[in-house]
Amino acid sequence: MGEITNVMEYQAIAKQKLPKMIYDYYASGAEDEWTLKENREAFSRILFRPRILIDVSKIDMSATVLGFKISMPIMIAPSAMQKMAHPDGEYATARAASAAGTIMTLSSWATSSVEEVASTGPGIRFFQLYVYKDRNVVEQLVRRAERAGFKAIALTVDTPRLGRREADIKNRFVLPPYLTLKNFEGLDLAEMDKSNDSGLASYVAGQIDRTLSWKDVKWLQSITSLPILVKGVITAEDARLAVHSGAAGIIVSNHGARQLDYVPATISALEEVVTAAAGRIPVYLDGGVRRGTDVFKALALGAAGVFIGRPVVFALAAEGEAGVRNVLRMMREEFELTMALSGCTSLADITRAHIYTDADRLARPFPRL
């Protein structure tokens, strides 16, 4: 293959390089994978209304997330077990994020520990958290993330049980024997049993707390001073509850279409959540973001920033740290170009009037003058 010109090209390379079980784990979605496809396709139904003859010789893409200044509103979502993709795993991702001046979110189910990732050098990092049945485990994880200098907790709230990922069932997915879930070493929670199903599904069934509810968000606030992002909100009702719970922010996410199939694409759910949050807390988005144009569309619909997951893992598999750096560079350059061609010189310039959605077409066939 010649020069990589967009982030999607890394997926084909990753598919060639990775064992089938590992590629399928990263790439697949739940059941019919309708939402997996829709996460991408919904972006293609949003069109631009660019403004012209505006001086775009200087463009500022910098963003502030929970008080932290970053170079662009494009961050790295938590993706589990990255050493399956490349021996450097989360180390490489952390270094690439830091070099790009943006935020990495480390998965609870990482193959590198919070301490190891912190040792890669300075950087703004968030820690993604699942709530285990044993709350002592949760407290230990949060304390360790705090000590390692992590700046926020991204609490995943859409996984009381693991979605039915049929590729993982067919492949009997299990973490390869040479790897462990590093954050759980010494807690008897670092390995998965080979089972007649997906090993990860069995692990979740055994360890993750199905009783998790809004009161536990309050409990989490009682054990940490770190801001808590609620990750997995896709309705107005839950957005209002997230605000009421004292969350520092919301991540509109359908878990990469890996949990409940036939939920809307995150970009389709975004405006409802933003409207319900009513500016009280910031709203972020993950799911299906592959282009700078996607980033712009999310910001026009009210997102304060986006997270990318699979593109990072596929680039990691293809080219290690250099691949992740390249993904962040391409996304940044595409986003900057989209801003310029839309007549925007800062994030504050990006408005709802810059895009045209399915809902707009139903409400009025042509924009009012």
Swiss-Prot record:
Protein activity control: Competitively inhibited by oxalate.
Tissue-wise expression: Expressed constitutively in leaves (at protein level).
Short sequence motif Microbody targeting signal: positions: 367-369
Reactions this protein catalyses: glycolate + O2 = glyoxylate + H2O2
EC number per UniProt: 1.1.3.15
Domain of life: Eukaryota
PROSITE patterns with a match to the protein in the record: FMN_HYDROXY_ACID_DH_1, FMN_HYDROXY_ACID_DH_2
Residue numbers marked as site, Involved in determining the substrate specificity of glycolate oxidase: W109
Any GO BP annotation: photorespiration
Assigned protein family: Belongs to the FMN-dependent alpha-hydroxy acid dehydrogenase family.
Record-given protein name: Glycolate oxidase 1
UniProt organism field: Oryza sativa subsp. japonica (Rice)
Protein's gene: GLO1
